[in-house]
Amino acid sequence: MSFSPLSLAFSIAPRLPLRVVMRMADTGASIAARRGGAMIDRLRANMARLTGTEPSADELRAAVRSHIRNYAEQLMLGSRRGAPLLEGVSFEGFEALAAASEDGPVVLALGHSGSWDRAGAWVCAHGRGIVTVAEKVEPPALFERFVSLREGLGMEIIGVAKGESVFSTLIERVRGRSVIVPLLADRDISGSGIEVDLGTGRALVAAGPAAL
C-alpha cells in the first residue's frame, strides 16, 4: 500500500460502518491477489518456504485477505465504530500474564501471525500497559500516523529503522514498570539477529526478546 491510499483510508475508514470497511478490505484483497505484483510474489514465496509447498490460489487469496484485513482493523480500532473488534477478543491466560507483570515487565516473543494491534488495544483497555517497538516506514508522515493511532489506544511505541538497535532504549523505558512488552521476533532488521531454522529454510530472527 502506498502512502496516498493509506492516508485517505486513515481519514475515511473510521467514519464508515465496520462491516463496510471489512467488505471493502476483502474486495481489495481479492483484486490484489488476482493482479499479483511484488508484494503478492513475496507472500507466495514466504508461504512456500514455511509449508514446503506452493500455495493454491485459494490459500494465497486467503492470506492476502488476512493481511489487508489487518490494516483495516488497525484503522478502525481508534473509532467508536471499531468497538466490536475489541469485544470479539478472547485472551486466554491474561490474568496470569497481568499478575506476572506486577513484578516487572513481561516480554513476549511473537510472530507476524495476527492482529497484534487489536490484541494490544484490548490489553490496554483492560488496565495493563503495553510498550513495544515498531519498524519505521516511509514516508515519515505515514509512520507517525500509525504511531499516533497506537498511542491513542494506550500503547507506547519506540520506532526503529533498519540497521538500528533500540535495545538500550527499550530497557530504560520498561525497567521497573508493570508493563507487557510484546516484540515481533520472527524477522530481524537490526543486522545482528540469530540464524535459526524456520519452515523449510534458515532465517534471521531478532535476539532482543531473548536478551531482555
Where do the protein language model's features map onto the residues?
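Soluble catalytic domains of membrane acyltransferases
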Residues: 81-212
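Membrane-anchoring hydrophobic helices of lipid-metabolizing enzymes
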Residues: 1-110, 143-148, 154
